[in-house]
Amino acid sequence: MSQDLRSYLDKVRAERPEEFLTVSREVDPAYEITASIVKLEKEAKRRPVMLFEKVKGTDFPVMSNLHASRPRLAMALGCNPRDMQKTFLAAMENPIAPKEVNNGLCKDVVLKGAAVDMRALPQVVHLGGDGGPYIT
């Protein structure tokens, strides 16, 4: 089972490279990201993990479709797709306690106080009926 997002993405890239798509050109978070995902699904019948590296207005990338297929979700859970329900229920019945660490990958970038600016995060508008941009 993948222990974190990075190891999961590395596993998808290595074992299912056709299911990982990197978009290197700049995209607009207002409608364009969602339009790209929908177009790929409708025209090519594909739902790969999508990494948008350059998102207008932010220094952060955007990822989508992380678990958009049963086989990828099963990969993340470390099981066969037909065993997903059993694996998930077993995990819920036997939870693993969180482990606090002083350093680690989750602490690569630490912002505190005035350095924290939520407006720096990508704010996506998915559809015309959205109330505006939001963080997902």
Give the positions of each predicted feature.
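Extended, highly charged
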Residues: 1-136
